[in-house]
């Protein structure tokens, strides 16, 4: 994604800040390693970037909204056939929550919703989160958009821009890949959501943590990374490769992407 999008994201965060006053058996102990970083200066999304599993088409980042909040999304629900939409205030309180059962189309289901909310202040920072889970109830994807909530006035909606693309792309690692040898090599490109550490993690379908790395990126530009995830399994094990970041406003994830694979000894 282009540098200009990064700069726009910075200006959005500055605007929002100025407008509000925030009232199995695991493997060896995971170790933090620095990423191999090669920032890109390309003016368009890098080859290989693809539409996100959760596309929040409306509202865009930095939108100023009154109640009801109009939400338009396209999301791949997965085996659960459910899409979870939550609106949070700047202190983490839940302002609105909707769960929709959808057909589960492989390319995603379209939803148009209205989320009612009430705030006591004239304005405050809000976070819209959309998530999906697998059939066992484990989070598999989550996307967030920061907006400004208004108690009255007129909504001003910004476009989604490059936010409709997935923040991560893995190189030479197809979905449902078979991995052997006790170590998964992961290379790709990632566009950070914020300045929080980025977690790359292997988790079995039973919910067991198998391996974890922590990556630190110096800025919010798209950047290349490379790491390895050692693991130990006694036989073929279905798992997911996760990459996620925590929200620096809410106490919880801001972004989650996962990909299915099978681990072999």
PLM features per residue range, with description:
Residues 1-265:
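Intrinsically disordered, low-complexity Ser/Thr/Pro-rich tracts
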């Amino acid at each position: 994604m282009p540098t200009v999008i990064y700069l726009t994201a910075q200006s959005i965060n500055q605007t929002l800040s100025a407008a509000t006053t925030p009232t199995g058996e695991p493997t060896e102990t995971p170790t933090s390693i620095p990423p191999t970083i090669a920032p890109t200066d390309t003016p368009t999304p890098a080859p290989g970037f693809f539409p996100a599993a959760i596309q929040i088409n409306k509202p865009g980042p930095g939108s100023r909204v009154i109640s009801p909040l109009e939400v338009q999304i396209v999301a791949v629900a997965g085996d659960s056939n459910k899409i979870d939409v939550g609106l949070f205030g700047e202190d983490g309180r839940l302002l609105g929550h909707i769960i929709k059962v959808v057909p589960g189309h492989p390319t995603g289901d379209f939803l148009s919703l209205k989320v009612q909310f009430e705030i006591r202040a004239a304005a405050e920072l809000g976070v819209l989160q959309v998530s999906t889970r697998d059939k066992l109830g484990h989070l598999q994807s989550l996307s967030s958009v920061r907006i400004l909530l208004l108690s009255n006035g007129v909504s001003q909606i910004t476009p989604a821009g490059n936010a409709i693309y997935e923040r991560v792309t893995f190189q030479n690692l197809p979905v449902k890949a078979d991995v052997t040898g006790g170590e998964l090599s992961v290379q790709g490109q990632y566009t950070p959501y914020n300045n929080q550490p980025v977690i790359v993690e292997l988790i079995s379908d039973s919910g067991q943590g198998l391996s974890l790395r922590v990556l630190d990126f110096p800025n919010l530009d798209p950047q290349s990374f490379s790491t390895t995830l050692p693991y130990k399994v006694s036989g073929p094990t279905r798992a997911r490769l996760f990459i996620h970041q925590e929200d620096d406003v809410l106490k919880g994830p801001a972004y989650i992407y996962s990909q299915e694979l099978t681990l072999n000894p």
